[in-house]
Amino acid sequence: MLSHVFLGISDFERALAFYRPVLSVLGVKERFCEPSRPWAGWESTPGPRPLFVIARPFNGEVPQPGNGTMVAFAAATRDQVDAAHTLALSLGAVCEGRPGLRPEYHAHYYGAYFRDPDGNKLCVACHAALL
């Protein structure tokens, strides 16, 4: 369904120091990193898409988080949700919702919410039932 998701960032090195470990916890692989542009991209599935990309805005203006915009990363387990949230907060993220069940979405939805150092709202969610 999606080709890519692009998030604007203000400090490339700071963003890399945040996203590399958080996405690694989720098993998402870095596909490219070009500091001269600067931009970097990750993918979780074999093949060219979908991509998650961070970069300074191409128009050179200051990045602004969207009001009502959120990127949600899939986690295979609830432990991954917990680990990603804890790691993100240790790297400077701001908590927007602690890990937990959210049955208002569906019976097995387990998610956590936070904002990256640029204020972009992110979620890590597991949709699997506990066996």
Language-model features: where?
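N-terminal beta-strand motif that seeds the catalytic metal site of vicinal oxygen chelate
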Residues: 1-16, 71, 127-131
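Short secondary-structure capping/turn micro-motifs that flank functional sites
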Residues: 38-40, 104-105, 130
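Short glycine-/small-residue motifs
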Residues: 121-124
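Short glycine-enriched loop/turn motifs at secondary-structure junctions
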Residues: 1, 64-68, 106
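Vicinal oxygen chelate
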Residues: 9-14, 72-112, 117
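Long, continuous compositionally biased terminal/linker segments
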Residues: 40, 44-83
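Core segments of cupin and vicinal oxygen chelate
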Residues: 8-51
